[in-house]
């Protein structure tokens, strides 16, 4: 049943991301990815807020299915940046500043390299004759 809640949350998060990024692009002219920035920041806020509010030391107790729905499903579908942010915050809260910094540096660098590499490969495939 947990998979069902995660799938529903992911679908809702993905649809929300699509709508928000489109709406923000229409409002701002799409010159800068403000929609994505908004998605990443708000998703990070949501996972940090909900995770802390409903965690072991939280004020509210919710079932594991609810946490999976919101934190993995909804936030995961909305943005994967929220998971990265929560993991980095947890490292910092544990005093693991070097690991937190490493997580930040590696995530940003490798994600940028991966998107660049994906772009390069796609351009190469697009330029192949007969494609």
UniProtKB/Swiss-Prot annotation:
Binding site for Na(+): 76, 79
Topological type in the membrane: Multi-pass membrane protein
Regulation of activity: Na(+) is not transported, but it plays an essential structural role and its presence is essential for fluoride channel function.
Chain segments annotated as coiled-coil in the UniProt record: none
InterPro entries in the record: FluC
Record key words, sorted: Cell inner membrane, Cell membrane, Ion channel, Ion transport, Membrane, Metal-binding, Sodium, Transmembrane, Transmembrane helix, Transport
Superkingdom assignment: Bacteria
Entry's Gene Ontology molecular function annotations: fluoride channel activity; metal ion binding
One GO term describing the cellular component: plasma membrane
Main location: membrane
Pfam families per the UniProt record, alphabetical: CRCB
GO process terms (BP): cellular detoxification of fluoride
Key word Chaperone present: no
Disulfide bonds: none
Transmembrane residue ranges: 4-24, 30-50, 68-88, 104-124
Catalytically driven reaction(s): fluoride(in) = fluoride(out)
Cross-referenced PANTHER family: FLUORIDE EXPORT PROTEIN 1-RELATED (PTHR28259:SF1)
Protein family (similarity comment): Belongs to the fluoride channel Fluc/FEX (TC 1.A.43) family.
Function field: Fluoride-specific ion channel. Important for reducing fluoride concentration in the cell, thus reducing its toxicity.
Protein name (record): Fluoride-specific ion channel FluC
Lineage: Bacteria, Pseudomonadati, Pseudomonadota, Alphaproteobacteria, Hyphomicrobiales
